[in-house]
Amino acid sequence: MEEFKRNLELDRSQQHDFIYPLIFQEYIYALAHDRGLNRSIFLENTGYDNKSSLLIVKRLITHLITQMYQQNRFLFSGNDSNQKKFFGDNTNLYSQMIFEGFAVVVEIPFYLRLLSFLEGKERVKSHNLRSIHSIFPFLEDKFSHLVYVLDILISHPIHLEIVVQTLRYWVKDASSLHLLRFFLHEYPIWNSLITPKKSSFSFSIRNQRFFLFLYNFHVCEYESIFVFLRNQSSHLRSISSETFLERISFYRKIELEVFAKDFKAILWVFKEPFLHYVRYRGKAILASKGTSLLMNKWKYYLVNFWQCYFYMWSQPRRIHINQLSNHSLDFLGYLSTVRLKPLMVRSQMIENSFLIENASKKFDTLMPITPMIGSLSKAKFCNVLGHPMSKPVWAALSDSDIIERFGRIYRNLSHYYSGSLKKMSLYRIKYILRLSCARTLARKHKSTVRAFLKRLGVGLLEEFFTEEEQVFYLTFAKASSNSGELYRRRVWYLDIICINDLANYE
């Protein structure tokens, strides 16, 4: 039993990082504020003082308290709304600096663990595994042999205090956790992470780093169950269920008699060796070679795990059981299916020959055209039916900038959907963007689309012909004499680490 406890701790007992003194490092706030939320902060410190300083933090907190007091005073006195807005903006500015600095500090222990994990490993390989496209070769290799899949939407915790309680097993620093708890209790708007509203969306964006840290940690805790089951699946048959209930950081010490009775009955679920798990953001996939009964057991276990450990009510509609042979998997912008491919094999035996018909499974990935047109419609490139429209907000730009923006959007889409089995949907997206670009230019110069297409001609076409397409045809044209075979080629890139919303191009 003692050996099992050590395995279940997942090396958390080695974490004794006291990060609270770093909160009073002046360069932390300068680095977090100057570099912004979307850049890496783990770089060498050049130009900042490494000595501890209470001055910068004291100033920030003093300004924050002062402005909050003045904001409340003006709020109840009914004075000019411009003054309230001015103080409110300053309050957000000071709070943003404090939250960004705190997020940087709390991330340090996790980053140190990442560095220790990467020591001795090939740097190129680790970067390749960061690519979103690296998931699809794995799916192609594994999912064609599986039968059922659990389509999971990861739930949010009921209250962010639960995240603080689980965070204390990783960060052995009570002072930092008290400060985190203070943030969550003093600013109720942080609960918008659970139920996002339009009124709090701007605040969430300004403190995006802190939101992402809390959510990623929550997902990391959720996924720790799969690491444990992977390591211990071959030893579960001889282990008593009481051992699981004694782990504080794995299951809360609960006295629910129903859960204790049912736990032994579902323990055999973990013996399944053909189990694969994939996640991106808030959506996860759990695929197995087992039966429908086995997948229902998994669904039952996950619901109990979320409710008893994370105190969250997992709705049944957040977990769907689907059969891969007759269900399209919507994941990472692709529609993935496992279809049967007939194969005729001729067998020769002395004087007789036989034709044997076999069916092999093949994993296909397709670009869904309907959601993509919906995204283009939301970004005002076309209407809901896919008819191209002009982009009035870009009419003030130069002609070269307009063409470059439209071309860049298509090149990014073509780069990402290069793994699609059929390229017809991608060609339709090219048509929409090219005509939308022409209509935007015609609107700017108060002319007709026909005149601009005649004027630009090949120039507009070249801007929408990607470098990947040129390399693609030069690479596979000689090896494929059949144009249909060339049309179905798939290419996965290992340099794609994020998916941007088309609306960001406003």
From Swiss-Prot:
GO CC aspect terms: chloroplast
Q: What is the lineage of its organism?
A: Eukaryota, Viridiplantae, Streptophyta, Embryophyta, Tracheophyta
Q: Where is the signal peptide?
A: none
Pfam families per the record? Answer: Intron_maturas2, MatK_N
Write down the superkingdom of origin.
Eukaryota
This molecule's function is given as:
Usually encoded in the trnK tRNA gene intron. Probably assists in splicing its own and other chloroplast group II introns.
Q: Which InterPro entries match?
A: Domain_X, Maturase_MatK, Maturase_MatK_N
Please identify the protein, giving its name as recorded: Maturase K
Q: Which family does it belong to?
A: Belongs to the intron maturase 2 family. MatK subfamily.
Where it sits in the cell: the answer is:
Plastid, Chloroplast
